[in-house]
């Protein structure tokens, strides 16, 4: 539980978390230098820590995971090249079309299954033949977790092997990869090992106020550093931000189990009201697909009781995080009973 704020019921996203007192102190005490010149010791330490944690050679600090993903895509693909991506993946649907707008990289979206996978035969069929009429397919990008669901390890292995057999690089949008690791019991490096690059967001479940990392080989990170400068992401005394990331990686990964447990309790509460159409909680998210329930009225009823939820792709999304405590979960239980008159 965040020790600087009162318990509240903001379930919109794990991005709403606020730094704890310990994290704020680490930020205030951070040793800083000019990160563009690689002279910020705290940022350098964070990058080394992230690379080691994910089993990669190098890492680069970014203002956001959106920019980290974009730099990763552009580091793998040149102008006019193509990357394969899920049709409902964040990197394609929710990041402003950056690869196309800023990188002149063409997306080839393919349908995601409900669990986030992309059919392997569809991937094979989407890879363009070596013909000058076609863009060159350079990259396969996957997302883990996907709507709160960890990708199956055997699928990751099969998809990345398929990509390599066709000469494609692989990138993982791992904004919540630590949630996937905690939920499956896998070491984060075992998940990252299948990919050429991985992005990691610090400002979601990890609880930092800002920041993300791109990890990969030294060569790829070197290209991404040049791209980061072009995108305006080269910042100076970033140690005050990196210190929050270090604090998060050291203290907030294992505690994600608490978020996952609370999400499971939410799912159990919602399951008592079948008309809410609650999905299962595999990590820190629960999705509702109400049947015969006015979603706006439902959300307004809860908001009037200081319980805020979000929506995503036609569903209500509930996300647990370090600012959600047991009392917040019980408030949801009481509000559900009141709403349905039970």
Kindly give the residue locations of the regions a language model identified.
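Conserved PLP-enzyme active-site core in the AAT-like
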Residues: 2-324, 332-342
């Amino acid at each position: 539980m965040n020790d600087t704020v009162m318990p509240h019921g903001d379930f919109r996203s794990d991005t709403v978390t606020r730094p704890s007192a310990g994290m704020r102190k680490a930020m205030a005490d951070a040793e800083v230098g000019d990160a563009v010149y690689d002279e910020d010791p705290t940022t350098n330490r964070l990058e080394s820590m992230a690379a080691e944690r994910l089993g990669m050679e190098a890492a680069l600090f970014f203002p956001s995971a959106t920019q980290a993903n974009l730099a990763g895509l552009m580091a793998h693909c040149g102008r006019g090249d193509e990357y394969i991506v899920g049709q409902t993946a964040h990197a394609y649907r929710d990041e402003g079309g950056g690869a196309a707008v800023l990188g002149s990289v063409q997306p080839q979206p393919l349908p995601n299954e409900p669990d986030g996978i992309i059919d392997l035969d569809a991937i094979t069929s989407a890879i363009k033949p070596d013909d000058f009429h076609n863009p060159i397919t350079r990259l396969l990008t996957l997302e883990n977790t996907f709507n709160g669901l960890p990708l199956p390890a055997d699928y990751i292995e099969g998809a990345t092997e398929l990509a390599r057999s066709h000469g494609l690089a692989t990138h993982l949008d791992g904004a919540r990869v630590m949630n996937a690791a905690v939920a499956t019991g896998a070491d984060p490096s075992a998940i990252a090992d299948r990919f050429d690059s991985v992005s990691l967001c610090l400002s979601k479940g990890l609880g930092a106020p800002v920041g993300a990392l791109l990890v990969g080989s030294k060569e790829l990170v070197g290209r991404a550093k040049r791209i980061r400068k072009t995108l305006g992401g080269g910042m100076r005394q970033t140690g005050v931000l990196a210190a929050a990331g270090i604090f998060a990686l050291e203290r907030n990964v294992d505690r994600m189990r608490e978020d996952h447990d609370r999400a499971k309790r939410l799912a159990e509460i919602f399951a008592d009201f079948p008309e809410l159409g609650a999905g299962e909680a595999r990590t820190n998210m629960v999705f509702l697909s109400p049947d015969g329930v006015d979603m706006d009225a439902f959300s307004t009823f809860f908001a009037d009781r200081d319980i805020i939820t979000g929506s995503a792709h036609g569903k209500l999304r509930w996300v647990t995080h370090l600012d959600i405590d047991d009392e917040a979960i019980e408030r949801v239980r009481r509000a559900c009973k009141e709403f349905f008159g039970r």
